[in-house]
From Swiss-Prot:
UniProt similarity note: Belongs to the G-protein coupled receptor 1 family.
High-level lineage: Eukaryota, Metazoa, Chordata, Craniata, Vertebrata
Protein name: Neuromedin-K receptor
Organism: Cavia porcellus
Segments for region (Disordered): 22-46, 390-440
Disulfide bonds: 133-208
One GO cellular component term noted in the UniProt record for this chain: plasma membrane
Protein encoded by which gene: TACR3
Keywords annotated in UniProt: Cell membrane, Disulfide bond, G-protein coupled receptor, Glycoprotein, Lipoprotein, Membrane, Palmitate, Receptor, Transducer, Transmembrane, Transmembrane helix
Amino acid sequence: MASPAGNLSAWPGWGWPPPAALRNLTSSPAPTASPSPAPSWTPSPRPGPAHPFLQPPWAVALWSLAYGAVVAVAVLGNLVVIWIVLAHKRMRTVTNSFLVNLAFADAAMAALNALVNFIYALHGEWYFGANYCRFQNFFPITAVFASIYSMTAIAVDRYMAIIDPLKPRLSATATRIVIGSIWILAFLLAFPQCLYSKIKVMPGRTLCYVQWPEGSRQHFTYHMIVIVLVYCFPLLIMGITYTIVGITLWGGEIPGDTCDKYQEQLKAKRKVVKMMIIVVVTFAICWLPYHIYFILTAIYQQLNRWKYIQQVYLASFWLAMSSTMYNPIIYCCLNKRFRAGFKRAFRWCPFIHVSSYDELELKATRLHPMRQSSLYTVTRMESMSVVFDSNDGDSARSSHQKRGTTRDVGSNVCSRRNSKSTSTTASFVSSSHMSVEEGS
């Protein structure tokens, strides 16, 4: 069985400081007589003044401020997002349910992982006990998996709603099942990290690490699988779906579909897709340096001896953790409903003014879900009957309108002004499943 030092030197677990971060502050290099190419170290109870990686007080203060700001903004912002959706019936939609799941995962990651990991990286000593050691190795992968697959579920839902709107949408029960399945799969993926977590009490300090039965190669293989499953694969899926959706929404105007109601729907769909693309791109950018760091330090282990490696780790980890705080800011900037919700949440601030329009944005009544489903079905039937209107002698125009049905329910009603009530119902129901679109 590989030694703890060997495992740590090979590749630390997700959210763990690099070997240099553990070695630099509380240890000194081992004698150079060993021919092993991997970094090795001998723990010592106190850091000596000659340690080149010891953080000066001003650097510790700056890093502490940076990490503290991320945690404060991420936890507060995501809790407000959860409150906005759960406290207002109009916001309880399929897509917003996934946004709540995303916000919960991000808030938990920031609150339970960021500061603890920062302290461990900075001090090189584990202060939090064996149980939290297991949790600390286990939860980061779980939370990141839940976050990115919530985004993936939104991307697939948007794809189905825009590309094939006549197919049934996810019900509230189905949405809960999808969210539950995401967390179950996340737990299964992260379980080995919990199973192999160890605490080692040494003279002068305590270490928390993951000790794999077959050593560093098994550890590296596992983390490459994790990177593929929680980064590469979901980003590929979202890239494909949003590309197709973007081509559909921005590919040009549909001839004949020029009524105001349809144009409003199209504009709203473009806004929400743009917002979600920004969320996904932000996540990808924030986590990319972190993944690159671990891959490079695992392959080129001599990098762990570089005197600036601790700074590189702290910077890449801060950027990854900062991904948890950007989503609430994006929602507030790009969506009217969420902006109104944030104003209500911070109305106690003297410079925040909540207008009557903001109140109306969140309090406007909506149809009951069952009634929505029935109206949606009736509207589809009415729309189809309009397409095959026997009074229309222009077969080419009928054929065009039939194609428009698959593009958007609202376009059917606009292109055939059969009745005002049909147009109103169709346009409302086509966007009722996603309040983000309504408020964009």
